[in-house]
Amino acid sequence: MCGIAGFFNPSADYTKEKNYRNHILEMMNQVQKHRGPDDEGTFLSPQCGLAHVRLNIIDLVTGHQPMRRVRGDHSCVIAYNGEIYNAPELKAELISEGEQFLTSGDTEAILAGFMRCGPSFIKKLNGIFAIALWDESCQTLH
């Protein structure tokens, strides 16, 4: 079981208080550390902060989160907990459409699918999950 936490305000500029906001994200991870003792990470942008602790089960080496993906001028960041049962099929479909992957887990597949298809991609997921996905390009938290 992993843990996700964060904050969002479309009118904020959290980077003006970068040290303070990063400290809050780190404290969020400390509170939820029991949910994922193997790895932790944070992400901070002007309007969004994400914190993630991870229990390594799948993709032990390259599954660090929050995970960021960039395609051209479109970039997104995900903090995710769960298991996508149909991830291999979704990943194969995305590869056939030209996507390339740097990791072996389902996190990057969710991120790539979202970036290719938009929020409707979530309807294709078969599994148990909680997702916080920050679309940096349109400054929207999904």
Regions found by a protein language model. Give the residues of each.
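N-terminus-centric sequence/structural signature that marks the extreme N-terminus
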Residues: 1-142
